[in-house]
Amino acid sequence: LTALTEQPYGMILAVGPTGSGKTTTLHAMIGHINTRERKIWTIEDPVEIRQPGLRQLQVVREVDVTFQSAMRSFLRADPDVIMVGEMRDVETASMAIEASLTGHLLVSTLHTNSAPETITRLTDMGMEPFAFSDALLGILAQRLVKRLCGKCREDYAASDAEREEFVRYLGEERLSKLTRSEGLRLWRAPGCQDCEYTGYDGRVALHELLVVNDEIRQAI
C-alpha cells in the first residue's frame, strides 16, 4: 500500500461500511507522503482529522462548497495529491477518475463490501470500465474488529464445530497451512482488571488489498 501511495498519479480507494475506519486509513496514506514538496488538497464532509501541511476544505452546501465544486477548483489549481472524502455520486466519481488520469494522485472512499465488488459498484454508477481501469492503482477493503486483551488472552484447542466453520470458509488445504502440528488452536480472553473484564482492548483493522495490475485491467 505504501508503494501505491508513492506513485505520481492514479486512484486508490478505501472501501467498507460506515464506521470501518476508511477516513483514518486515507489520512494514514496521506501522512506517508505528506512532505513540503507536495501540494496536497482535501475535500471532506466533515473534516474529522486535522493534518499539518494539507489544505483541507470542508463541504458547506449553503455556500455551494460541495465535492463537485471543490473538485472543479482543484483541477484548475493542479495540486499533486487530492483526497476526496467520499465518492457519493456520478459527477464526483467522474472528476476523480479524470484527475487521476491527468497527473494527480487521488485517494477516496466508497461504500462497498469488498475490493472486487468496487469494480461492479463503479460500473453501476455509470463509469466507463476502460477509464477507471486505467485510473485504478489499488482498492483497500477493511473492517474493524475487537482486539483481544493482551493481558488475559489464552489459546485453546478448537472444537470440532469451530474447526468445521474454518473448513467451510477456507477449505481443508488452506486451513492445514495455518494449523500447527497439535491441531487448530484459537484465542479467547475471559476478562481481567486491565480490560475491565470485557476481554477486549480496542479494535484492529482487517484489510483486503486488491492491487490493480495489467491482468486485472484487462479483465475489467
Task: Identify the residue ranges that each predicted region occupies.
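Short, flexible helix-loop junctions that flank or precede catalytic/ligand sites
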Residues: L1-I220
